[in-house]
């Protein structure tokens, strides 16, 4: 979805000689990389062991969306289930991007607002802007602010609603959002490193702390509350 949107955004460059072969190679590499999952799944489906059932639409995507406060939660419980948004967040699994990615996006905005920092690396500024834009789009699609239910109620878009419903859960947009915002945070550090190296070090340390501390808490919570996982097993 986001690859198609990117290609449409830069359609003049998409079909040029250096870009189109690179996109085809990336698509081929993605397919090969996922064969470890696709081949067994197809075998199970052919053998009748696994069947994909259930009809989903955009209304179901809204039901599985995430609150903004939940999206940037720093400390959450280590296990749980994906409840309906109408049931609140109690007992849900950790559905969060974390404060580290939010801080990375904020640092990048500070970088592009400073002309001296922004001009230090045009490539980093351009890549960071693209990843920030698409990353925020993915986060918006996962949030309860996205008008999934309005799309479901729009009769001319029923076919699109059913197609998008195959995603099943809105929080699956967290995967591309995470990868895109990680690149955005790295671009922020790169921009500051060339002009203000001390600020870049402080930003990198802050991002590292905001990543390690919640991860450590998550492991601690899992080891102390789960009956299946103990400290000895780790």
Task: List each model region and its residues.
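Hydrophobic, lipid-facing residues on alpha-helical transmembrane segments of integral membrane proteins
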Residues: 24, 28-32, 132, 136, ...
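Basic, alpha-helical nucleic-acid-binding regions used in initiation and control of genome expression
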Residues: 227-234
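Membrane-interface helix-loop junctions at the exits of transmembrane helices
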Residues: 33-50, 68-78, 129-168, 210-227
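Transmembrane alpha-helical segments
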Residues: 4-9, 104-111, 178-193
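Hydrophobic/aromatic-rich transmembrane helices and adjacent perimembrane loops
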Residues: 156-191
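Membrane-interface helix-loop-helix junctions at transmembrane boundaries of multi-pass membrane enzymes
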Residues: 12-23, 106-149, 196-199
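Periplasmic/ER-lumenal interhelical loops and adjacent helix-loop junctions
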Residues: 19-116, 127
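Conserved alpha/beta enzyme-core scaffolds, especially Rossmann-like or related mixed alpha/beta domains
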Residues: 1-5, 25-27
